[in-house]
Amino acid sequence: MDNEQRLKRRENIRNFSIIAHIDHGKSTLADRILENTKSVETRDMQDQLLDSMDLERERGITIKLNAVRLKYEAKDGNTYTFHLIDTPGHVDFTYEVSRSLAACEGAILVVDAAQGIEAQTLANVYLALDNELELLPVINKIDLPAAEPERVKQEIEDMIGLDQDDVVLASAKSNIGIEEILEKIVEVVPAPDGDPEAPLKALIFDSEYDPYRGVISSIRIVDGVVKAGDKIRMMATGKEFEVTEVGINTPKQLPVDELTVGDVGYIIASIKNVDDSRVGDTITLASRPASEPLQGYKKMNPMVYCGLFPIDNKNYNDLREALEKLQLNDASLEFEPESSQALGFGYRTGFLGMLHMEIIQERIEREFGIELIATAPSVIYQCVLRDGSEVTVDNPAQMPDRDKIDKIFEPYVRATMMVPNDYVGAVMELCQRKRGQFINMDYLDDIRVNIVYELPLAEVVFDFFDQLKSNTKGYASFDYEFIENKESNLVKMDILLNGDKVDALSFIVHRDFAYERGKALVEKLKTLIPRQQFEVPVQAAIGQKIVARTNIKSMGKNVLAKCYGGDISRKRKLLEKQKAGKAKMKAVGNVEIPQDAFLAVLKMDDE
């Protein structure tokens, strides 16, 4: 193909993604677009076709992004090449969304006709506008009995500033309005710009590992051409590889001769090491490199850390391999080795949020067959010590002694909640209870309010979202972004079993809530830890000071069962012997701690 043909082809390429709040019908719309462009044969068609992970289908959510090439014959007689990049909608996976958008020129904004605009709809719109994408608004599910398309149209105009007349009314499930959406894509989404003669620049927006072919990177070509046999260079690491195959996804992988300007496809270059193909890096040709890399998207930092330990210590190395493989597709996952007296060897792992954490744990157990114990998640604290040095703490067990610390800073987030009017009181009460600071309240219309609070991330991370949903009967939507670290009056709470600290049960808590949290936790542990042959005291302590205590009673064995009548001194001797035995056991005895006990720290607020 010469450059003239490449330029002509470029004019007919449309790269777009679909963005929406969770559950507004994004994956169903993607299915319909695939069907209507005849990209998938009817017999291969299944619901949520682009959600390739079993977990995604089970939970009905999209976790990983996916890219597909489609052919569409428009009414103007031309055949267009569409690249559809499917994105997740959940707040933990905003990162995946920002990666998809970096590879597009336009986005379909899907809004539910009954629910209207929600918090994550707005968050994703701002991401799209930051990437200078053209937006095509679609109101989905218009055939629902509760649908109010006219109200939602007005919302889109008022809140996002898109013209009502540009809105397409559709129902992905019933195949209504899909043809109009396809025509609008041709009309609204601009063709990619880029020069086929310039040095190669390709953005890696995703990568996965194949045990036979090495790393497969999903790329978007911005300038230049790449084909099999080319020698490529990664601009971040400077490493060079020879390309063995380039191709496109039609959802199935299909090798092609070359990828050129505007194309979205995959590249295989027998890369064995995950770190050599970093998401966000720019690929260029070794023989004719580009002068500077593409503007990559911002790296997301983990917000939540927890310890993952294999139940069987033999699996320690397998766990490392599992985490490395998951990290390849999920650049926001971080991990480093850690050891715990209670749990042995494992990894301190960083996640974007609680859903992300659950999904990674479930994938490790399911895909790699490793049974895990997870410790309570914690956020990152900055400590300024009395000698002026600073320490970063992501594990409560490593918190320095309180008398050495001058100040502790914890991360705060700005939380935006959209709530029906009737529940404003309940939501504000929840935020106050979680140490929130009220910032702003906006009445969007006569039924919904937008409430903005600044909250400590540690309070949001545990079960804030669940409590918000239950306080509003499931109607609230929620989005948050990190703002800054603020000084707080925090203390480390240690749990002692039989006088020994259990490092995996330590947690960091605000001084005002320390007594209640400590008391609630020891009472909870009393019910979870099985009774031993000897009495076990459970204590909660701040430094040297015990703030709460309870005892787990011992199991009694009747040593007098064999004494029928007879001498009291004989009985006394047996009882004294039992008592001495229990005292000895207590001095050397270890207490087995079940997995539920580690999770008890999380479920503290449910009571």
Curated annotation (Swiss-Prot):
Per the record, its GO cellular-component terms are: plasma membrane
Cellular localisation? Cell membrane
Entry's SUPFAM superfamilies?
A: EF-G C-terminal domain-like (SSF54980), P-loop containing nucleoside triphosphate hydrolases (SSF52540), Translation proteins (SSF50447)
**Annotated GO biological process:** positive regulation of translation
* Chain residues that bind GTP: D23, H24, G25, K26, S27, T28, N140, K141, I142, D143
Disulphide-bonded residues:
none
What is the superkingdom listed in this entry's lineage? Bacteria
EC id? 3.6.5.n1
The record, for InterPro entries, names: EF-4, EFG_III/V, EFG_V-like, EFTu-like_2, G_TR_CS, LepA_C_sf, LepA_CTD, LepA_IV
Q: What topology does the record note for this protein and the membrane?
A: Peripheral membrane protein
Which CDD domains does the UniProt entry name for this protein?
EF4_II, EF4_III, LepA, lepA_C
Q: Which GO terms describe its molecular function?
A: GTP binding; GTPase activity; ribosome binding; translation elongation factor activity
Could you tell me what reaction this enzyme catalyses?
GTP + H2O = GDP + phosphate + H(+)
By sequence similarity, the record places it as follows: Belongs to the TRAFAC class translation factor GTPase superfamily. Classic translation factor GTPase family. LepA subfamily.
What is the name listed in the Swiss-Prot or TrEMBL entry for this protein?
A: Elongation factor 4
Q: Which organism is it from?
A: Staphylococcus aureus (strain NCTC 8325 / PS 47)
Provide the taxonomic classification.
Answer: Bacteria, Bacillati, Bacillota, Bacilli, Bacillales
What gene does the UniProt entry assign to this protein?
lepA
